[in-house]
Design a protein with these regions (language model features):
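Single conserved hydrophobic/aromatic residue that forms the stacking wall/gate
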Residues: 143-152
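Active-site beta->alpha loop and helix N-cap motifs at the rims of alpha/beta catalytic domains
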Residues: 2-12, 17-142
Length: 152
């Protein structure tokens, strides 16, 4: 059973940090992470919509998570959003997140096309299997998961 205590309190989404030329800024990411820690948050949700995950490359997403973990590991709860538009990259991000020691990985269903619940379940199960020692959180967004309300 998961230790749900680590998910209590304030766990804001981490905004993406860019340099003045529009490239992902590792230094600004580290500084923002430290700022949140100094403010007393209980954790961070890294790489979701606020982190502009859809617009970043897989390697940029890895670098951002590495920067966050360098500053925050062992200090606050880290949840890494790993959803991509293809299962292989999502699984790669899941394994990478686990290798860094995040507390949990999370994902919305694939976006763009509405998939049947069994296809979404397979997508999530594949990601969870890629990080078997890390807790998996289904990111429930009404826009992306309303079709999962059935009991199929």
């Amino acid at each position: 059973m998961a230790n749900l205590k680590k998910y209590e309190g304030i766990i804001p989404a981490l905004y993406a940090c860019y340099d003045d030329n529009g490239a992902v800024s590792i230094e600004r990411t580290k500084a923002l992470t430290q700022w949140f820690i100094d403010q007393g948050v209980n954790g961070l949700y890294v790489g979701g919509s606020s982190g502009e995950c859809i617009y970043q490359t897989k390697d940029e997403r890895k670098a951002v998570l590495e920067a966050v973990m360098e500053v925050a590991k062992g200090k606050i709860t880290i949840i890494a959003h790993i959803a991509c538009n293809n299962t292989a990259e999502s699984c790669e991000l899941a394994a990478h997140a686990e290798s860094l020691g995040v507390d949990a990985i999370a994902s919305i269903p694939p976006i763009y096309f509405k998939l049947p619940p069994y296809a979404i379940a397979k997508y999530w199960n594949d990601m969870s299997a890629a990080a078997p020692n890390t807790e998996f959180i289904i990111y429930r967004s009404e826009e992306h998961t309303s079709e999962l309300q059935s009991r199929e």
